[in-house]
């Protein structure tokens, strides 16, 4: 479950954001499943005005998992389009993990593109690697990163890309690669059914990751994290499902709607 913050950013960052001006305000809902158990829910509110996008996201753990790993998070992010490129403006997260509070805020100045950030508490450098200031040049937030990816897909281009990401606590490089096209069946009530484009994701940590961890990023494959993009609304490709395979099992995210 330590991957949850990254997964949330990857999947909730993209609904309806891509290229359609007519999608001015939309709500989306996702279930989170681990094995056969529903362990959480995500609600997403997306607002678009002219060339800017704002997201408000609430995620909560649910069921038996809450007894062992109580999690909740409120995320606000905004991006804007300038010179045909989506750029970051704000990425802010208030979260609680096992009743411990975490806050992070990253702000990019629109004029000089420089960033400022604040986190509380500070990184515990006995448990995680430091984030060198020298690595923060030309970074974007996870939401803006996936907006760029989904825009490529909606322009009939492969999702292949490499991006430099910073979310306030973690600095990593994100690589995406188109794997295949796959027809999804609606294996759960209200889940998506139809053709999808499958993109694989690899994450290379550059700071903020745990010093002692079972995660070995050098052994990761693009097939370990899959995002399924389907035409769920207005002929736009949106993330309709996501699968994360790790040593502790498989976590699946499913968009919920009346398809």
Which residue stretches match the model-derived regions?
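Sec/Tat signal peptide C-region and signal peptidase I cleavage site
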Residues: 15-20
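A charged, solvent-exposed segment within the mature domains of Sec-exported extracytoplasmic proteins
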Residues: 112-174
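Acidic, serine/threonine-rich low-complexity disordered tracts
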Residues: 21-110, 156-259
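Sec-dependent N-terminal signal peptides
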Residues: 4-13
């Amino acid at each position: 479950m330590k991957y949850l913050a990254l997964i949330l950013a990857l999947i909730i960052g993209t609904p309806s954001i891509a290229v359609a001006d007519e999608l001015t305000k939309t709500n989306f809902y996702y279930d989170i499943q681990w094995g056969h158990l529903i362990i959480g829910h995500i609600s997403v509110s997306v607002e678009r005005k002219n060339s800017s996008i704002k997201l408000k996201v609430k995620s909560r753990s649910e069921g038996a998992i809450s007894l062992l790993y109580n999690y909740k998070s409120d995320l606000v992010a905004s991006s804007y389009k300038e010179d045909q490129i989506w750029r970051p403006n704000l990425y802010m997260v208030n979260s609680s993990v096992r009743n411990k509070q975490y806050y992070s805020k990253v702000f990019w100045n629109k004029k000089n593109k420089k960033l400022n950030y604040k986190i509380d508490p500070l990184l515990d450098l006995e448990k995680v690697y430091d984030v060198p200031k020298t690595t923060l040049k030309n970074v974007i937030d996870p939401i803006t990163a996936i907006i760029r990816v989904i825009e490529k897909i909606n322009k009939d281009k492969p999702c292949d890309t490499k991006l430099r990401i910073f979310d306030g606590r973690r600095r990593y490089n994100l690589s995406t690669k188109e794997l295949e096209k796959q027809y999804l069946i609606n294996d759960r009530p209200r889940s998506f059914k139809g053709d999808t484009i499958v993109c694989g994701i690899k994450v290379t940590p550059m700071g903020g990751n745990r010093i002692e961890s079972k995660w070995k990023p050098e052994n990761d494959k693009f097939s370990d994290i899959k995002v399924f993009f389907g035409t769920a609304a207005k002929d736009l490709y949106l993330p309709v499902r996501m699968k994360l395979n790790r040593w502790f099992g498989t976590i699946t995210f499913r968009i919920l709607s009346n398809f």
